[in-house]
Swiss-Prot record:
Catalytic site: 132, 136
Any single GO BP term: diaminopimelate biosynthetic process
Binding-site residues, (S)-2,3,4,5-tetrahydrodipicolinate: 133, 142-143
Gene3D superfamilies linked: Dihydrodipicolinate Reductase, domain 2, NAD(P)-binding Rossmann-like Domain
E.C. designation(s): 1.17.1.8
GO molecular function, one term: NAD binding
Summary of the function given for this chain in its UniProt record: Catalyzes the conversion of 4-hydroxy-tetrahydrodipicolinate (HTPA) to tetrahydrodipicolinate.
Cellular location(s): Cytoplasm
Keywords of the record: Amino-acid biosynthesis, Cytoplasm, Diaminopimelate biosynthesis, Lysine biosynthesis, NAD, NADP, Oxidoreductase
Name of protein: 4-hydroxy-tetrahydrodipicolinate reductase
GO cellular component terms given for this protein: cytosol
Pathway: Amino-acid biosynthesis; L-lysine biosynthesis via DAP pathway; (S)-tetrahydrodipicolinate from L-aspartate: step 4/4
Top-rank taxon, per record: Bacteria
Amino acid sequence: MRVGVLGAKGKVGATMVRAVAAADDLTLSAELDAGDPLSLLTDGNTEVVIDFTHPDVVMGNLEFLIDNGIHAVVGTTGFTAERFQQVESWLVAKPNTSVLIAPNFAIGAVLSMHFAKQAARFFDSAEVIELHHPHKADAPSGTAARTAKLIAEARKGLPPNPDATSTSLPGARGADVDGIPVHAVRLAGLVAHQEVLFGTEGEILTIRHDSLDRTSFVPGVLLAVRRIAERPGLTVGLEPLLDLH
């Protein structure tokens, strides 16, 4: 399988370049960064592209990839419901093309989101804290936003988080994602970390995941690359490939 990498000079992208090059069943067909023409992907007969670029350019990348029938595995964040709808509309004309967009490719992070969804209905309160390096473009992270949405979905019909706060500085209680407070920390020395806190009378449950190195994303990305052709259309999250429901 011929695989191209977009964002190849970034920290995650460079990790993916090394991972693809080291895989016996994959061939690195192209490695592109800012300013490189996307036509290098078609020139190299690329079948699947790994995209770790920037929210400002990822939609243009996807439009090109879909138009050319190239499968895409996307770790770039910043996706909204409107962006997902746009991707789906592009895919209508290319029914055999696959796009997988995931907020996090670390297997442990995907499992932590799954565990949080399972735990959500058993506790009165839930909050999410995500911690990342200071170069991250979006806040909160895609992982934190998706975690909060999964928690909110699991808590449908239950009372909202108890919170008597009546006065506060703007932002002190975090961002509100479907009723779940999400707090973002940006600190030098961090990579990617998340805590989900659940509380009820007499006990607290903490679900924490830490990516200590960007190689933590490699197994999930390569799994998606190898299996993406099995799932035509848009897939959001790595969960379907891990049989997590």
